[in-house]
Amino acid sequence: MFDPETLRTFISVAETGSFSKAAERLCKTTATISYRIKLLEENTGVGLFFRTTRSVSLTAAGSHLLSQAKDWLAWLDSMPDELRQVNDGVERQVNIVVNNLLYSPQAVASLLSWLNARYPFTQFHFSRQIYMGVWDSLLYEGFSLAIGVTGTEPLANTFMLDPLGSVQWRFLMSADHPLAHVSGPLTEAQLRRFPAINIEDSARTLTKRVAWRLPGQKEIIVPDMETKIAAHLAGVGIGFVPQPLCQTLIDKNELVSCTIPTMRPPSPLSLAWHKFGGGKAVEDIVKLFTQRQPEIAGFLSIFNTVRCEKSSHFANWRVK
């Protein structure tokens, strides 16, 4: 009923509004075009066109068919290439989860551009998660690969890991915060008087981690690192921030870095993927990271000894 030639004929008639013009476009006779449309209407049991002596126009059913027919035809035309890709061991879909600390729109776009050029028929799905939420996606939600799982050892022996680096932290507050000019290491009693600004762990199944908060201390949860830094600048609270994201603000005396009794150790992050069942696209992504290719450099900038500057409204953080 919906063979490629019939779909092309229907689309041409709908677009030209004429059997004769569709015949010219398809290098067929008008009688052939008219017969195909008549047969299609008989097989579907509905009228697809209103006919006048000079033109034809779509019925409601015809409009609905047109909205679907182009997608069907494109799918049929691409199917041979898709089948060859699957036969060559290329995944039909690859789900990639990225740690919030490593996430960058530009980094994702760079990797997507590289992947899309090589695997045009693979569906790529990116997700942004926080702390143990990255492992959660890999363990329980069908994700193929994770950029920035916590630690350097897998949570299950079915995964492979490649250490990417360690995030260095600074304990921060605004320059006009009451604790900013206290001499010497701050005590827990002093710290507890002010809210801890944190980003909530996005784990759904695994146990959530709390970045830093003292017993009895008020906690304020924000959705991302940009908001967290903005809250520090506004004097709302205190807490740890990755050094590359705050060093310029420290140098400008907009933020103050202090020492507290228990400093946060560096956080090692790794690339993680399934040992078994992966295809060529995942293999190529792993190679990009293990070989530290430029296509993935944007994900690793937080590990470098670089400084970042704040753009307006704290919307983006540009590595210089």
From Swiss-Prot:
DNA-binding residue intervals: 19-38
Protein name: HTH-type transcriptional activator AllS
PANTHER family: HTH-TYPE TRANSCRIPTIONAL ACTIVATOR ALLS, TRANSCRIPTIONAL REGULATOR
Transmembrane segments: none
DNA-binding as UniProt keyword: yes
Natural source organism: Salmonella choleraesuis (strain SC-B67)
Gene this chain is encoded by: allS
PROSITE patterns: HTH_LYSR
Recorded superkingdom: Bacteria
GO MF entries: DNA binding; DNA-binding transcription factor activity
Segments forming domain HTH lysR-type: 2-59
NCBIfam families documented for this protein: PRK10094.1
